[in-house]
Design a protein with these regions (language model features):
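Glycine-rich Rossmann-fold phosphate-binding loop(s) that bind the pyrophosphate
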Residues: 17-20, 42-43, 180-183, 213, ...
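Beta1/beta-strand and adjacent pyrophosphate-binding region of the FAD-binding site
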Residues: 7-19, 173-183
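FAD-site-proximal beta/loop scaffold in flavoenzymes
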Residues: 159-174, 257-333
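Glycine-rich flavin
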Residues: 2-11, 28-35, 40-173, 206-210, ...
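Catalytic nucleophile loop
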Residues: 22, 183-186, 320
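Flexible, glycine-rich terminal cap/loop adjacent to redox cofactors
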Residues: 16-21, 25-43, 48, 55, ...
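Short hydrophobic core segments
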Residues: 14-16, 121, 137-147, 179-180, ...
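Glycine-rich dinucleotide-binding loop and its adjacent helix/turn
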Residues: 54, 144-205, 279-281, 285-296, ...
Length: 458
């Protein structure tokens, strides 16, 4: 880094947003000799994933799974009784863990030599940011990594609802909750709260929840949620929410009123770009408010980059981290590196759990002739148990190349399984490659290598 650069700017890189992507970019860039890095975060370091998303949600999934596990243990000979769930005790442990993780993020930044600012920052020029306390700082490169925020429709009484941000901080669990939305966040929290013993209702305006995912997987998950006790009502909407005597009266599109102790909206997320000042320096935002970038995460303003959910490309934490690494290669190492957004494995922590990589059956058949290998069965651990727990294993195969175009798993531990299956799919494995692998018996996942004949062709 030459002396002129050091003199011209306060920083070589200034990052706005202390989530997984922003922190990774700051840390790795700071490892460059002489590079001065600053980062601003208005909330808590760790961002959505660590503080109010993936991590606390997964811990809630664990917590909610113990009640059915204890019920099932009786069938296996254990003399156990399911007691009441202690929400305050769980919250104390949860907050301790989140504090620990945030401290790790802060320590990593400090040890890397990154200067941190616990303040909101906005962009006021191609090389300038303004902190909430009025200080203006200059930087050779600015990286926007502000993530996304919950989006709530404008309806009468919207001020009464909570979102996934607030669900972790409830003083007590409601007896009866309405969750509005049909995406993965809505379905995940429906399963969690139902597992805690909350009378859980999910309303969705579309015909079927989990739009955009594989149809067969959606059906298995929906059936599993209902059998576990979640009330799912589709093709309905809320028109008004009134707070009456400590409860919430929700009016649906038919004019019928329903009473709940709490209403949670999980109707999607939007890029966190409001008030950042990007429009003032001619950085393009799309219709959803996402920062428009090229394959190298660069905006039309050469000195400004953006990564993660704020770009609304693939909104997953591991993707934001990969985008951060590619950004450093591009901006600091002189090695322009695009991010590969194809064939990314992902999971939905519904109950039952869903893991997938590649194309859905509908997507694949629109592209080329395919074969579909699928099996739906009760797993071995339910041999003594009269409870709903169906497993789906599904491979979508190209008729022409024999490559596995998509893999879908609905089962306990599906997320763990899809990580391994994803390696094969990413490498371009064919159905015959899967067939060559000896099964591990007895397991659920052995079905991935023992399905010999296609169920259907399309």
């Amino acid at each position: 880094m030459n002396e002129r650069t050091k003199m011209d700017f306060d920083y070589d890189l200034f990052v706005i947003g202390g989530g997984s992507g922003g922190v990774r970019a700051a840390r790795v860039a700071a490892s460059k000799s002489g590079a001065r890095i600053g980062i601003a975060e208005e909330s808590r370091y760790g961002g959505t994933c660590v503080i109010r998303g993936c991590v606390p949600k997964k811990l809630m999934v664990f917590a909610s799974s113990y009640a059915p596990a204890m019920r099932q243990a009786v069938s296996y000979g254990w003399d156990v009784a399911t007691g009441a769930f202690d929400w305050p005790a769980f919250q104390i442990n949860l907050e301790k863990e989140l504090d620990r993780l945030e401290a790790v993020y802060r320590k990593l930044l400090k040890n890397s030599g990154v200067e941190t600012f616990d303040l909101r920052a906005t962009v006021t020029g191609p090389h300038e940011v303004c902190l909430a306390d009025g200080r203006k700082l200059t930087s050779k490169i600015i990286l926007i990594a502000t993530g996304g925020v919950p989006s709530i429709p404008l309806i009468e009484g919207a001020e009464h609802v909570i979102t996934s941000n607030e669900i972790f901080h409830l003083k007590k669990l409601p007896k009866r909750i309405l969750i509005v939305g049909g995406g993965y966040i809505a379905c995940e929290f429906a399963g969690i709260l139902n597992g805690f013993g909350v009378d859980t209702h999910l309303w969705y305006r579309g015909p079927k929840v989990l739009r955009g995912f594989d149809e067969e997987a959606r059906d298995v998950i929906t059936q599993g949620m209902k059998e576990r006790g979640v009330t799912i009502i589709t093709e309905t909407e809320t028109t008004k929410i009134d707070k009456i005597e400590g409860c919430f009266v929700v009016t649906d599109i038919s004019g019928v009123e329903h009473t709940f102790d709490l209403v949670m909206y999980a109707t999607g997320r939007r890029p966190n770009t409001q008030g950042l000042g990007l429009e003032e320096i001619n950085i393009n935002l799309d219709g959803a408010g996402a920062v428009e970038v090229n394959n190298y995460s660069q905006t039309p303003i050469a000195s400004v980059y953006a990564i993660g959910d704020v770009t609304d490309r693939v909104n997953l934490t591991p993707v934001a981290i990969r985008e951060a690494m590619a950004f450093v290669e591009t901006a600091f190492n002189g090695n322009p590196t695009p991010v590969d957004h194809s064939l990314i494995p992902s999971a939905v922590f519904t109950q039952p759990e869903y893991g997938m990589i590649g194309l859905s059956e509908d997507e694949a058949q629109k592209r080329e002739p395919i074969e579909v290998y699928t099996t739906n069965f009760r797993p071995m651990n339910t041999a003594f148990i009269d409870e709903p727990n169906k497993v789906l294993m599904k491979l979508i195969v190209s008729q022409a190349t024999r490559r596995v175009l998509g893999c879908h798993i609905v089962a306990d531990g599906a997320a763990e399984m899809i990580q391994m299956a994803g390696i094969a799919v990413k490498m371009g494995a064919t159905k015959e490659d899967f067939d060559k692998v000896c099964a591990v018996h007895p397991t659920m996942s052995e079905e991935l290598v023992t399905m010999k004949s296609p169920i259907r062709k399309a």
